[in-house]
Amino acid sequence: LRSLGLKAGDHMAVLLENHPRFFEICFGAQRAGIIFTAISTRLKASETAYIIENCGARLLVTSKALASLADDIVPLTPAVQHRLMIDGTTLGHQAYETWMASQACTPIPDQTAGGDMLYSSGTTGHPKGVFIPPDSPDYDAPTSLMGICQTHFGFGPSSVYLSPAPLYHAAPMRFCMSAMRLGSTCVIMEHFDPERFLACVETHRVTHTQLVPTMFVRMLKLPAADRQLHDVSSLQFAIHAAAPCPIPIKEQIIDWWGPIVWEYYAGTEGMGMTLVRLSLI
């Protein structure tokens, strides 16, 4: 990133599906002091371009899977100076793999903390960028997300975290990055599928996961025989947020998985978090 002329405090945009390279890009930005904005892949070209221009991105990283959208936003994002594309390339985009192969493997001498600047959903107008200074709080502070993951959710080197949601959302991205900083293994689904989710839990002996209530509903709609096909006894924490969970749905999940369900309320702005677990009710 520094080789492209980006310096600490500059902005870049990440427009990717749940791709294996997603986090190497985010962690690279963090170590170089870059502020990165992950963007929903479900937006229209004009909506995507608005966020890219508004956040002041000098670099855009995308993938061949999103080539059509990436091509459409080129004329709408004149401030972008560099465009990298993973798994292939189109006109106006440099191949990410070729660019990476030319980079040095030694750490940069002046590593500076960067961070994310995510955008609101735009329900009251244009989406709004939420900038949180990278050093407030420190990543390992007890009140940081990483601190909460360690002290309340028990993340550690033996943990396996399953993330079934789009990584451009705040919770999936930030929880995965916190888990990896704590030495945990992260298993990331390309997209949520109820039966595939259960199979991943069994195959990878997943200990932690985070879902939204609609995912609970879809799993509960599976035939009982299909739900019992997979061993989910490794699960220790099932964390959910994003929307209130109907009481009957939560009760059915607890009957199935046991008293491991945690609910939290928080916001992209990082102003605080409220945690609720069954044993405290």
Where are these regions (language model features)?
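Phosphate-binding glycine-rich loop
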Residues: L1-H11
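AMP-binding (ANL) adenylation modules
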Residues: L4, E17-P20, P166
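Structural core segment of the AMP-binding/adenylate-forming
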Residues: S3-L4, F27, R31-S102, P107-D110
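A short helix-loop-beta submotif of the ANL/AMP-binding
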Residues: H11, E17-A45, E53-L59, I73, ...
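Conserved S/T- and glycine-rich ATP-binding loop of Class I adenylate-forming
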Residues: M12, A29, L60, S120-T123, ...
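Gly/Ser/Thr-rich phosphate-binding loop
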Residues: D116-L118, R181, V206-L211, L222-I281
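Conserved AMP-binding/adenylation subdomain of ANL enzymes
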Residues: D138-V160, P164, Y168-H208, L222
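Conserved AMP-binding A3 loop
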Residues: G115-T143
